[in-house]
């Protein structure tokens, strides 16, 4: 058994907040605060308002979550392209 059971829920990013935080509305209508997982930060995955994401929520605090996947949708907004390539 895992140290802590996590709930996986889908939602849509409503707002991008300072310090890599996000406000996400879950499928059931609940609004939670979230942050990007370390794997997403390491791989420079951008999360924009309107993106569909998968969250992990702890059973102990259902107001905070960790974004661990950004779904690719045809109608989701695209990040702006910068002129310089990544190193």
UniProtKB/Swiss-Prot annotation:
Positions with biased composition (Pro residues): 77-87
Gene3D superfamilies attached to this UniProt entry: Nucleic acid-binding proteins
GO MF term set: ribosome binding; rRNA binding; translation initiation factor activity
Annotated keywords: Cytoplasm, Initiation factor, Protein biosynthesis, RNA-binding, rRNA-binding
One Gene Ontology CC term in the entry: cytosol
S-S pairs: none
Protein name in the entry: Translation initiation factor IF-1 2
Naturally occurring in which organism (per UniProt): Burkholderia cenocepacia (strain HI2424)
